Swiss-Prot record:
Chain's role: This protein is located at the 30S-50S ribosomal subunit interface and may play a role in the structure and function of the aminoacyl-tRNA binding site.
Record's protein name: Large ribosomal subunit protein bL19
Transmembrane segments: none
Family statement drawn from the similarity comment of this UniProt entry: Belongs to the bacterial ribosomal protein bL19 family.
Gene responsible for this protein: rplS
GO biological process: translation
Cellular component terms (Gene Ontology): cytosolic large ribosomal subunit
MF annotations from Gene Ontology: structural constituent of ribosome
Length: 127
C-alpha cells in the first residue's frame, strides 16, 4: 500500500462514520443535513441506489427516486459531513453494477425484485 492509501484509511477511521453495507438495487434512506439561513435541519431522501463508486475517501453513490411523477437523481459523497445517516430499507436483487437503464423505465417495468435471505442462513439463525 502506498502513502496516499494509508492516509485515506486513517482519515476514514478518524471520521468514525458508521456506513451500512449497501449495493445497487437497494432502497436506502439518506438523512441529509440541510442549512437554510441560520436554521439547520435533517432532510430524508429515499430512493433506489443506481450506482456506487468505491474510491476510498472519495467514494460516492447515486440515489434515484420518483418525486411527483418526475425522476430525480442525487449523487452523495459517502464520507460527506452533510450526510447524517444512511439506512437500508430493502435489499434489491439485480445483476448489474450500474442501473442506468432505470432512467428510461417507468411504472411496473422499473420495479426491482426484493432479495430474500437464503434458506440456509434463515435455518441457521432459527436453530
Amino acid at each position: 500500500m502506498n502513502l496516499i492509501q494509508i492516509l485515506e484509511q486513517e482519515e476514514i477511521a478518524r471520521l468514525n462514520k458508521t456506513i451500512p453495507s449497501f449495493a445497487p438495487g437497494d432502497t436506502v434512506i439518506v438523512n441529509v443535513n440541510v442549512v437554510e439561513g441560520t436554521r439547520k435541519r435533517v432532510q430524508a431522501y429515499e430512493g433506489v441506489v443506481i450506482a456506487k463508486r468505491n474510491r476510498g475517501l472519495n467514494s460516492g453513490f447515486t440515489v434515484r427516486k420518483i418525486s411527483s411523477g418526475e425522476g430525480v437523481e442525487r449523487t452523495f459523497q459517502t464520507y460527506s459531513p452533510l450526510i447524517a445517516s444512511i439506512e437500508v430499507k430493502r435489499r434489491g436483487d439485480v445483476r448489474r453494477a450500474k442501473l442506468y437503464y432505470l432512467r428510461e423505465r417507468s411504472g411496473k417495468s422499473a420495479r426491482i425484485k426484493e432479495k430474500l435471505p437464503s434458506r440456509v442462513k434463515a435455518a441457521a439463525v432459527a436453530a
